[in-house]
Amino acid sequence: MAVTGGGRPAVRQQAARGKQMQRTFNNVKITLICGFITLLVLRGTVGINLLTYGVGGGGGSDAVAAAEEARVVEDIERILREIRSDTDDDDDDEEEEPLGVDASTTTTTNSTTTTATAARRRSSNHTYTLGPKVTRWNAKRRQWLSRNPGFPSRDARGKPRILLVTGSQPAPCDDAAGDHYLLKATKNKIDYCRIHGIEIVHSMAHLDRELAGYWAKLPLLRRLMLSHPEVEWVWWMDSDALFTDMAFELPLARYDTSNLVIHGYPELLFAKRSWIALNTGSFLLRNCQWSLELLDAWAPMGPKGRVRDEAGKVLTASLTGRPAFEADDQSALIHILLTQKERWMEKVYVEDKYFLHGFWAGLVDKYEEMMERHHPGLGDERWPFVTHFVGCKPCGGYGDYPRERCLGGMERAFNFADNQVLRLYGFRHRSLASARVRRVANRTDNPLVNKEAALKMDAKIES
């Protein structure tokens, strides 16, 4: 037999009446106290006036008046503090009352409130999410595009619209050199996007305090995908990565059936479970429901603190060669693709035919040789598409390589790419180590004819 506790409603009503009576009593008390305060103020004012004007008005009288006024003010403040304290206690009781009811209610008396209590407990220990779950995004996006023909998903050349996304910390770098090379890297990205008709966003905002460091890109990418339904591909690129083949274009037709394009090595990924099998410094996400769900699955290891520390232990145990440190976005993605292969890998394109990510240490000293033997537009080891300064940390902190070597390599990479831009105007850098330029051709004597030649971005560059 279920005991329903039929007397509880009467008890609750009696408690409510008691609360109402207590509240009425407090109001009366406050009224009386306010009247008493008024009398004190009048008494103090009259007394002060009598002391000041009724008696000779000497300096001693002024001191007595000041002391009397201070005492009155102190009494008033003390009484007001007591009133506030009483009111706060009443408010706390009213706020805690529902929690008390939930705590004392059993499953047989009120299953709804029990469910609500359990939901609150789950929410206090919930899995991190990037935001409210988005459903049917593909259909919603198609509908939006049909209603907004002024925002087509293809550019003027008929190619899928791409949004390049990069970011840097809100605060300045530790020294001016870091800010200088960050500016150069941004200028490099702007040049590539301008040449190829790509839009660019450089974010300096942390959209979620929980996802700092490597993880800051995830909420940013999600927000941009939802805010720009006209964009077909969102392309993330780290701030310390530079385009070094300004003529190379992404082979987007190759990815017609893919939603994630990332540089990596399939053998390292599946056979060796290496933690460097993929690189998240440069990757493309299609703006679709699948990508939103991948971001949702990717994010829970990212919140800073204990969650990230514990996830790091899992990743170190799961992936070959990974040092023991907190969870990073690259290891987390590799772990997800390996442990949930059937769910995700069908739509992942692991690109190894060109350098969507090229490790800088083996490239920056070979640029002169590349100019002697090859030409832009290849994108692979002969003329790398992207040179990524992994482990350098030019903006500050402790990098894996000497700072001078990193900054020198970034200077060479920037000038190597900048020469491909400057030749449109008849200039080039004096050397890859120098910011100074010299004129190598007169592009102004017959500008339209010269422009046709200059626009051949894949033409050989003289060393």
Curated annotation (Swiss-Prot):
Domain of life of the source: Eukaryota
What is the protein's name according to its record?
Answer: Probable glycosyltransferase 3
Sorted alphabetically, the Gene Ontology BP terms of this entry are:
xyloglucan biosynthetic process
Q: Which residues are glycosylated?
A: 110, 125, 442
The way this protein sits in the membrane is described as: Single-pass type II membrane protein
Q: Which organism is it from?
A: Oryza sativa subsp. japonica (Rice)
Major localisation? Golgi
TM regions (residue ranges): 25-47
